[in-house]
């Protein structure tokens, strides 16, 4: 699991605009999290970059005039976790039904 840090230099933009640095993460987390957070109505901008292909770092930017960026990030991670949990439950249910049908035939 990676670590999370806040990129220095954002203080002048207020608490609604921050860039977070995830270590040992890449496009898988970045794109999924961006897709979720970008849909929040209070978010003005959300995006990510991988600064260099040889570095295992993900820079994740959130801008909002209403809410703190750290709170939006936390909510996004919680929503992503809920989506993953739902996907696992749905998959396991469908697999059980498929296997039951296979046994019957």
Swiss-Prot record:
CDD domains: RNAP_I_III_AC19 (cd07029). It is found in: Nucleus. Keywords: DNA-directed RNA polymerase, Nucleus, Transcription. It comes from the Eukaryota. GO terms for molecular function: DNA binding; DNA-directed RNA polymerase activity; protein dimerization activity. It holds the Pfam family RNA_pol_L_2. One of its GO terms (cellular component) is RNA polymerase I complex. Its main location: nucleus. GO terms for biological process: transcription by RNA polymerase I; transcription by RNA polymerase III; transcription elongation by RNA polymerase I; tRNA transcription by RNA polymerase III. Component of the RNA polymerase I (Pol I) and RNA polymerase III (Pol III) complexes consisting of at least 13 and 17 subunits, respectively. DNA-dependent RNA polymerase catalyzes the transcription of DNA into RNA using the four ribonucleoside triphosphates as substrates. Common core component of RNA polymerases I and III which synthesize ribosomal RNA precursors and small RNAs, such as 5S rRNA and tRNAs, respectively. Belongs to the archaeal Rpo11/eukaryotic RPB11/RPC19 RNA polymerase subunit family. This is DNA-directed RNA polymerases I and III subunit RPAC2. It comes from Drosophila melanogaster (Fruit fly). The gene is Polr1D.
């Amino acid at each position: 699991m990676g670590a999370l840090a806040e990129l220095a230099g954002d203080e002048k933009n207020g608490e609604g605009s921050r860039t977070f640095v995830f270590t040992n993460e890449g496009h898988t987390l970045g794109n999924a999290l961006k897709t979720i957070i970008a849909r929040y109505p209070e978010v003005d901008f959300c995006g990510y970059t991988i600064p260099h292909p040889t570095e295992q770092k993900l820079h994740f930017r959130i801008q909002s005039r209403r809410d703190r960026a750290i709170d939006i990030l936390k909510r996004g991670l919680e929503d992503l976790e809920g989506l993953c949990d739902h996907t696992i439950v749905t998959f396991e249910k469908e697999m059980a039904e498929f296997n039951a049908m296979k046994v019957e035939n």
